[in-house]
């Protein structure tokens, strides 16, 4: 009986630790390609967000100003997939991150560069 209680406490601890670490894990986004020739698109993918929830995408221009915040909806796995149109973008490096208001978390900041010169893609 004593061993059963100890086992129950251990199992409860492991489950609680797993639940806490799953809740505190920050969402992650990636962009592809990281350097793109204007006017071709950039693909953004994200994981680790609250499932079936609204998230807020932020995109900062090379001059430090931000585009209008874009609201997106995650799938049942907490994933997002979005194509970024570069047609109105000037050359330079852009910063992208996504907020998850429900979980009160923010993704990493991903960067991509828009260029008008095809030679820049060879570097």
At which residue positions do the language-model features occur?
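Extracytoplasmic/secretory-pathway segments with low complexity and glycosylation-like composition
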Residues: 20-123
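Hydrophobic h-region of N-terminal signal peptides that target proteins for export
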Residues: 12-20
């Amino acid at each position: 009986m004593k061993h059963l209680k100890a086992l129950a406490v251990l199992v409860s601890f492991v489950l609680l630790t797993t639940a806490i670490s799953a809740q505190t894990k920050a969402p992650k986004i990636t962009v592809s390609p990281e350097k793109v020739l204007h006017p071709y698109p950039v693909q953004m993918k994200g994981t680790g967000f609250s499932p079936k929830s609204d998230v807020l995408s932020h995109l900062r221009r090379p001059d430090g100003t931000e585009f209008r915040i874009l609201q997106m909806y995650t799938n049942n796995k907490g994933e997002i997939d979005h194509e970024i149109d570069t047609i109105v973008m000037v050359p330079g490096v852009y910063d992208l991150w996504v907020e998850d208001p429900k979980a009160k978390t923010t993704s990493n900041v991903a960067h991509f560069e828009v260029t008008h010169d095809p030679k820049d893609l060879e570097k």
